[in-house]
């Protein structure tokens, strides 16, 4: 099978230490966009929430997978703590908060409406 033509080489290495954190419209939330395919919506990002920061209630456009690296992410369904993983189905709604801060690796099949707007603005 031929490599994906999205890259000049068969692999694309992303040096996270050379990437700056990008502020988002949500106070206390920063992201590093690791991969985004506008044609399909596929998005991989690191997200960092300051202690007490949250994300306004939103609906997932498609499957989202989150691996919490540090801290915890809490919503009305429970808490996902460091070293753990949560999957959110298409159509699920929540308003997560990070009581003690949180750093997470997030995979979206399609970004939420708010993330889509942010990506369109070039963040």
Please give the residue ranges for each predicted region:
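A short, N-terminal "cap"/entry segment at the start of jelly-roll beta-barrel domains
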Residues: 1-40, 121-123
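Conserved hydrophobic/aromatic beta-strand scaffold that supports enzyme active sites
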Residues: 31-33, 44-48, 65, 85-87, ...
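Short, charged/polar surface micro-motifs in flexible loops or helix N-caps
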Residues: 39-41, 50-53, 74, 111-113
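Glycine- and acidic-residue-biased ligand/ion/polar-headgroup-sensing regions
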Residues: 51, 59-75
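Residue-level marker of beta-strand positions
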Residues: 54, 84-85, 103
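Short acidic-glycine-tyrosine-enriched beta hairpin
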Residues: 75-95
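Ligand-binding loop in jelly-roll beta-barrel domains
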Residues: 90-115
């Amino acid at each position: 099978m031929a490599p994906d033509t999205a890259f000049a080489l068969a692999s694309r290495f992303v040096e996270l230490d050379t990437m700056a954190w990008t502020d988002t419209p949500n106070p206390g939330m920063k992201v590093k966009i690791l991969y985004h395919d506008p044609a399909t919506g596929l998005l991989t990002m690191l997200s960092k929430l300051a202690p007490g920061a949250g994300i306004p209630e939103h609906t997932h456009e498609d499957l989202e997978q989150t691996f919490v690296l540090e801290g915890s992410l809490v919503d009305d369904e429970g808490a996902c703590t460091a070293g753990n993983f949560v999957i959110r189905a298409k159509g699920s709604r929540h308003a997560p908060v990070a009581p003690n801060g949180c750093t997470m690796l997030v995979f979206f099949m399609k970004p939420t409406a708010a993330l889509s707007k942010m990506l369109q603005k070039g963040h």
